[in-house]
Amino acid sequence: MDNSSTGRYPAASLPPAYLRPGSSSFTDFLRAQAPELLPTARSFPEGSVVQAAHGTTIVALTFKGGVVIAGDRRATMGNVIAQRDMKKVFVTDDYSAVGIAGTAGIAIEIVRLFAVELRHYEKIEGVSLSLDGKANRLSGMVKGNLDAALAGLAVVPLFVGYDTDAADPDRAGRIVSYDVTGARFEETLGYQSVGSGSLFAKSALKKLYDPDADAEGAVRAAVEALYDAADDDSATGGPDLVRRIFPVVVTVTAEGAVHLPEERTSAIAETVVEGRRARPAG
């Protein structure tokens, strides 16, 4: 059987662009070869208003030996609940995770591209990006969405990671927040929240945060903060015991970034709800 390029099964070949040496950034490669595939490759007529689902509240806090990030599950479209079980927290590589607030569709595309960006860099360079490098790459992607943000489709991620180069492993958990222009801000207080319920969540974390807590205590504080946000912000969804919908939680430690099993998050959420029956104000 003839398997040559002139036979029945032509030999597969990659386009020259795939073999040309260049940047270790997958985003740069995509921008050069297929810019229409970028999440930010959209144009909006002047004065247009687009109705789209929005993710709401994300919280993050450090603990002794790592960092936890958690998000509620509600997505809204104006005054309507668009989705009750949306996932807004994603593991992006072995030592980082991202939570999203803002326009859900664009935000999810950006996070997926960010995860590919990190894997691509590691394959090309043979090493992982530093935590600062990861935060800067995400900053550039948020900045690229500025035109959409001005049209009302803003994306505001919350980035967390474990710094494998930190001098003190107990304080290696880090949190980075962004504004819609892509400016990045390192959080020094040990906790942060973004989204519509962030004001209430941060107020809760101000009282609940303990830098020496273990992972279990930090997860409990995160769920408590999301409960408080849902209590006062209609766009944030609290634990739904009827539909069995609970926050998505990721911990990042020296062992890596891990999604908490739903059985564990549901048990913690149920404990929080039970405690609020006795003390509604927390």
From Swiss-Prot:
Keywords: Autocatalytic cleavage, Cytoplasm, Hydrolase, Protease, Proteasome, Threonine protease, Zymogen. Its EC number is 3.4.25.1. The formation of the proteasomal ATPase ARC-20S proteasome complex, likely via the docking of the C-termini of ARC into the intersubunit pockets in the alpha-rings, may trigger opening of the gate for substrate entry. Interconversion between the open-gate and close-gate conformations leads to a dynamic regulation of the 20S proteasome proteolysis activity. Belongs to the peptidase T1B family. GO terms for biological process: modification-dependent protein catabolic process; proteasomal protein catabolic process. One of its GO terms (molecular function) is threonine-type endopeptidase activity. Its main location: cytoplasm. It is found in: Cytoplasm. One of its GO terms (cellular component) is cytoplasm. The 20S proteasome core is composed of 14 alpha and 14 beta subunits that assemble into four stacked heptameric rings, resulting in a barrel-shaped structure. The two inner rings, each composed of seven catalytic beta subunits, are sandwiched by two outer rings, each composed of seven alpha subunits. The catalytic chamber with the active sites is on the inside of the barrel. Has a gated structure, the ends of the cylinder being occluded by the N-termini of the alpha-subunits. Is capped by the proteasome-associated ATPase, ARC. HAMAP family: Proteasome_B_B (MF_02113_B). It is an enzyme of class 3 (hydrolase). Component of the proteasome core, a large protease complex with broad specificity involved in protein degradation. Residues 1-55 form a propeptide. This is Proteasome subunit beta. It catalyses: Cleavage of peptide bonds with very broad specificity. InterPro entries: Ntn_hydrolases_N, Proteasome_sua/b, Proteasome_suB-type, PSB_actinobac. The active site is at T56. Pathway: Protein degradation; proteasomal Pup-dependent pathway.
